[in-house]
């Protein structure tokens, strides 16, 4: 069991940094989506995370526990982010929060469980499998790393391997034909393009990694 402990302030910083990342990469993610989707992935995520960060101080004051913070953030994303990514990311954060009811601190094993179950909620919502050219092509390889982790290993090394697996999974979408979403209609024309949801998902999980490094 790791001694690494994360409190509500940690997750507040994560959400702030996720918002900053999305602002920085908004045009890049929107460009990816323009190739095979509606061309609004980065824009929609920007709208959602701006609203989360707008309400963040109030959320941390009114809802000091991690569960409520993440569930309310997920509900904001669900309501503010258009397209498929709103329900998917909303489901992820809401499930992460639901996993730790009333807690103001979680350890590394609990964090891993939150992410594993959050990814399962995304899969349940989107009904996507590995190879469908969706964010599950990033999440599923990453989840496998967390599920098979050595609980005695260094948490940073474990989470780095998780993020690396997600990044590789995102890259694996480039040669795929899409089986879900708007890209489905393109058929073979989707080959050669990176799935925007898989790209944003590993990038957002990397934000958690960077904050874990600061917490050690």
UniProtKB/Swiss-Prot annotation:
Reaction catalysis annotation:
dihydroxyacetone + phosphoenolpyruvate = dihydroxyacetone phosphate + pyruvate
Protein name (Swiss-Prot/TrEMBL):
PEP-dependent dihydroxyacetone kinase 2, ADP-binding subunit DhaL
Location comes to: Cytoplasm
Function, in words: ADP-binding subunit of the dihydroxyacetone kinase, which is responsible for the phosphoenolpyruvate (PEP)-dependent phosphorylation of dihydroxyacetone. DhaL-ADP is converted to DhaL-ATP via a phosphoryl group transfer from DhaM and transmits it to dihydroxyacetone binds to DhaK.
Any remaining note in the record? Unlike the carbohydrate-specific transporters of the PTS, the complex DhaKML has no transport activity.
- Origin organism of this chain? Listeria innocua serovar 6a (strain ATCC BAA-680 / CLIP 11262)
Summarize the record's induction comment: Repressed by GolR.
User: Any idea which UniProt keywords this protein has?
Assistant: ATP-binding, Cytoplasm, Glycerol metabolism, Kinase, Magnesium, Metal-binding, Nucleotide-binding, Transferase
Originating gene: dhaL-2
Query: What does the record list as GO biological process?
Result: glycerol catabolic process
**EC number(s) for this protein?**
2.7.1.121
Q: Which residue ranges does the record assign to the DhaL domain?
A: 9-210
UniProt xrefs under Pfam families: Dak2
Q: Which InterPro entries match?
A: DhaK_L_YcgS, DhaL_dom, DhaL_dom_sf, Dihydroxyacetone_Kinase
